[in-house]
């Protein structure tokens, strides 16, 4: 079974699928012991279990197929800590031939979605009824208390998705930049109102607009438009925001008794305020009196902080999103990016490196504090930024990433890219529920011989320690539990481990070790669910050939890319590239076959041979080589790499290239300048954009409109084939990549040429029909020759 087939079963990719038994042997691997985990990956077969999981009373692991079961005594032994646990009475029918789904050996992952029963006046979780199991068991059904903070709609029901479903849906706060030009504002209004019309009526909604001021709309006031206005310059605390909005409890006497009633009309169920919300959107007037030579006043940071303060004050626990629509940088208040005076240019990478930035560090600090509040309250921050200029995504990135939100950098809100991204967020499942996952927590349980170092991805450490947490931290470390506000079916987190040999004890080669991932989340219908993935691998001796055969070079490259961009946040890019190079030399020296001091003898086996190539393209990728990108673009690229799985990460690191010609069907070709020839069409996929490149002869024939001649049907089919394939490539990606169409020697061809291996340059002998690249960059062949020379040194 190959690594992709294993991922389809487990939702995991391992850099090494067999682990050495000692810490020193693990360190000699160079590539760390790591697992890329997609918590809510879509499986073709995922058993849904309608009751709560059984938990080991000692280590907290969930009952799984690796547990040893004594059917006579109804006892199960935890494979992680070996503690013996009693089965409850509801498992009385368990036998070797009558197993619950969580013990089926074929299920690496199961999902618990308890069917609750309501018990009036009770806030405890107790068995109250019996649900029939598909395999003949009866399991107690448990009730869960309603958690709505809105007393008028606090009751709960049972829905088809399982779990307790609050009558209140998720909350959405729409934060709109009122400094947009009229056409852009019209496009935002049209698309946002479209998705609002599709929302379930129990969803909570609010509207905030901002320019130099921040306006919070009172959606419960119908006589006229009523807003609470905040000055955009002020950085208010959550308590101050809530005080000015009048959030909290008012005391009233009813039949001689004092009662507390929540009074607010800024965040209301859609069914109560849809007309007022639509009217408020229609009344937003674009700013027209911008001073010549100045940027519009935008208080973006104050608006986001106000939206979060509103959600915090309303104690929303059903999941919530702050959705920001902006067309320029913040020019005042907390989170400011640049002064409004156009004589002050927006910061570049060089400005950040040299420290010539007025606001960058302070604004990053503001958004990092905001990120903690977002995660503490399980609020998602989505930013849709459409502008020809930078908008401050580099500063905003941390808050968006740590909350799991979407970041879109586009040119105009009238684009199909924006429409598709916005509507994708609000898609529904077969039962009509929003396909959203809120309030997500991740927990890792391991056997005693390993330690958890940390995680890299859109998660925040909860700083919960136990015996399996390492003192060495990588990324978000110092914990066995992490949190984020939301994930998607594609969100992927990289976890790092090391082997612990305390008191000189080490596991026996050939024995198994276990890792369990427990993901808790709230579905779009309000139901709480828990997905449990339990997997096993084997310990091997340090020099065992199983180590080499277990190496997954695609996962290793993805992991090293995340480590590299994590380092790049603190170090200069040149230092990060040096770190990558030194690691690659040690890796090649460790796993290459060679005669010492003889570079020509160097060989790598097939399961290692692609790894140096991945590192070559990573060093010259947009993640580390930021020369041609703005800080906003770099922040976006790194955010996407830090959340995508192995397959998409590899496309980002080493893009794919397909050749279309009259000789036959499309074929993959080398990512090399020699692949550019006049008589072919190339389809280039870098994940962030897709290029359809016509060779000079193809472009000439197209301009002569040969494809419109019925006698040249083959040529027409040749032109259509890459267009169809490009459309399929971008279909499932959010945000949708840009499709660039260009001709050989045209200006847009730079999107392709910049990513190709410069095997033919102005310094090399040039023969044949391929292009040349004007560059001083090292080619892949020179890179590999240097690697071989350094790897074979004593």
Swiss-Prot record:
Topology relative to the membrane: Peripheral membrane protein
Record function comment: Component of the coat protein complex II (COPII) which promotes the formation of transport vesicles from the endoplasmic reticulum (ER). The coat has two main functions, the physical deformation of the endoplasmic reticulum membrane into vesicles and the selection of cargo molecules.
Cited Gene3D superfamilies: beta-sandwich domain of Sec23/24, Sec23/Sec24 helical domain, Severin, von Willebrand factor, type A domain, Zn-finger domain of Sec23/24
GO terms, molecular function: zinc ion binding
Assigned keywords, A-Z: Cytoplasmic vesicle, Endoplasmic reticulum, ER-Golgi transport, Membrane, Metal-binding, Protein transport, Transport, Zinc
Location relative to the cell: Cytoplasmic vesicle, COPII-coated vesicle membrane; Endoplasmic reticulum membrane; Membrane
UniProt entry tagged with the keyword Zinc: yes
Name used for this protein in its record: Protein transport protein SEC23 G
Subunit structure: Component of the coat protein complex II (COPII), composed of at least five proteins: the Sec23/24 complex, the Sec13/31 complex and Sar1. Interacts with SEC24A.
Family under the similarity heading: Belongs to the SEC23/SEC24 family. SEC23 subfamily.
An example Gene Ontology biological process: COPII-coated vesicle budding
Organism superkingdom: Eukaryota
GO terms under cellular component: COPII vesicle coat; endoplasmic reticulum membrane
UniProt keyword annotation of Transport present: yes
Region Zinc finger-like, annotated ranges: 56-81
Binding site for Zn(2+): 56, 59, 78, 81
TM segment ranges: none
């Amino acid at each position: 079974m190959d690594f992709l087939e294993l991922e389809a079963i487990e939702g995991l990719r391992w850099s090494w699928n067999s682990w050495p038994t000692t810490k020193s042997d693990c360190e000699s691997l160079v590539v760390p012991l790591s697992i890329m985990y997609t918590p809510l990956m879509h499986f073709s077969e995922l058993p849904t279990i309608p009751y709560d999981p059984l938990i080991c009373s000692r280590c907290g692991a969930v009952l799984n197929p690796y547990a040893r079961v004594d059917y006579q005594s109804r006892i199960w032994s935890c494979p992680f800590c070996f503690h013996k646990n009693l089965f409850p009475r509801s498992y009385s029918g368990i036998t070797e031939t009558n197993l619950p789904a969580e013990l089926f050996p074929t299920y690496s992952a199961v999902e618990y979605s308890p069917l609750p029963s309501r018990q009036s006046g009770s806030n405890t979780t107790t068995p109250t009824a019996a649900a029939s199991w598909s395999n003949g068991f009866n399991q107690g059904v448990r009730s869960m208390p309603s958690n709505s903070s809105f007393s008028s709609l606090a009751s709960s029901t049972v829905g088809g998705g399982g779990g307790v479903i609050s009558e209140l849906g998720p909350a959405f706060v729409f934060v709109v930049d009122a400094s947009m030009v009229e056409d852009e504002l019209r496009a935002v209004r049209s698309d946002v109102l479209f998705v609002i019309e599709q929302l379930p009526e129990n969803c909570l909604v609010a509207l905030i607009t901002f320019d130099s001021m921040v306006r919070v709309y009172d959606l419960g006031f119908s006589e006229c438009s009523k807003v609470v206005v905040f000055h955009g310059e002020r950085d208010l605390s959550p308590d101050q925001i809530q005080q000015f909005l009048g959030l909290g409890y008012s005391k009233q006497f009813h039949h001689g008794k004092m009662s507390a009633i929540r009074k607010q009309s800024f965040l209301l169920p859609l069914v109560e305020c849809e007309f007022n919300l639509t009217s408020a959107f229609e009344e937003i007037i674009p700013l027209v009196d911008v001073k010549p030579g100045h940027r519009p006043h935008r208080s973006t940071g104050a608006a986001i902080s106000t939206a979060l303060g509103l959600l915090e004050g309303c104690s929303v626990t059903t999941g919530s999103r702050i959705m920001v629509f902006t067309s320029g940088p913040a020019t005042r208040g907390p989170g400011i990016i640049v002064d409004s005076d156009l004589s002050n240019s927006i910061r570049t990478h060089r400005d950040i490196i040299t420290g010539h930035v007025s606001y960058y560090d302070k604004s990053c600090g503001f958004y990092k504090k905001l990120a903690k509040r977002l995660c503490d309250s399980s609020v998602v921050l989505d930013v849709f930024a459409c502008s020809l200029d930078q908008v401050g995504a580099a500063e905003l990135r941390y808050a968006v990433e740590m909350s799991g939100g979407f970041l879109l950098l586009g040119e105009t809100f009238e684009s199909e890219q924006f429409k598709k991204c916005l509507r994708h967020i609000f898609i529904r499942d077969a039962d009509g529920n929003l396909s959203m996952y809120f309030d997500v927590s991740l927990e890792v349980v391991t056997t005693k011989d390993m330690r958890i170092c940390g995680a890299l991805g859109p998660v925040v450490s909860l700083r919960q320690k136990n015996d399996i947490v390492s003192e060495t931290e990588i990324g978000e470390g110092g914990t066995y539990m992490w949190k984020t506000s939301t994930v998607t079916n594609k969100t992927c987190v990289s976890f790092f481990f090391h082997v612990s040999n305390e008191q000189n004890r080490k596991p026996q080669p050939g024995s198994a070790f276990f890792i369990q991932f427990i993901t808790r989340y709230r579905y779009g219908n309000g139901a709480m669910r828990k997905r449990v993935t339990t997997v096993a691998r084997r310990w091997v001796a340090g020099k065992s050939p199983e180590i080499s055969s277990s190496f997954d070079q695609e996962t290793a490259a993805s992991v090293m890319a995340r480590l590299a961009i994590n380092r790049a946040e603190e170090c200069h890019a040149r230092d990060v590239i040096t770190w990558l190079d030194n690691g690659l030399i040690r890796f090649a020296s460790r796993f290459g076959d060679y005669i010492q001091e003889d570079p020509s003898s160097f060989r790598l086996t097939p399961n290692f041979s692609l790894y140096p190539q991945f590192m070559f393209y990573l060093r010259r990728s947009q993640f580390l080589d930021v020369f041609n990108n703005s800080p906003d673009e770099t922040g976006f690229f790194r955010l996407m790499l830090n959340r995508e799985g192995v397959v998409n990460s590899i496309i980002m690191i080493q893009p794919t290239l397909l050749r279309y010609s009259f000789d036959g069907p499309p074929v993959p070709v080398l990512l090399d300048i020699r692949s550019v020839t006049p008589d072919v069409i190339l389809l280039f996929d870098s994940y962030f954009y897709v290029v359809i490149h016509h060779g000079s002869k193809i472009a000439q024939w197209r301009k002569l409109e040969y494809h419109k001649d019925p006698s040249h049907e083959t040529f027409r089919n040749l032109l259509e084939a890459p267009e169809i394939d490009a459309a399929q490539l971008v279909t499932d990606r959010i945000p949708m990549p840009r499709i660039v169409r260009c001709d050989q020697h045209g200006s847009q061809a730079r999107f392709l040429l910049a990513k190709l291996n410069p095997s033919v340059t102005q310094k090399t002998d040039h023969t044949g029909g391929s292009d040349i690249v004007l560059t001083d960059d090292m080619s892949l062949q020179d890179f590999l020759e240097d690697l071989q020379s350094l790897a074979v040194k004593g």
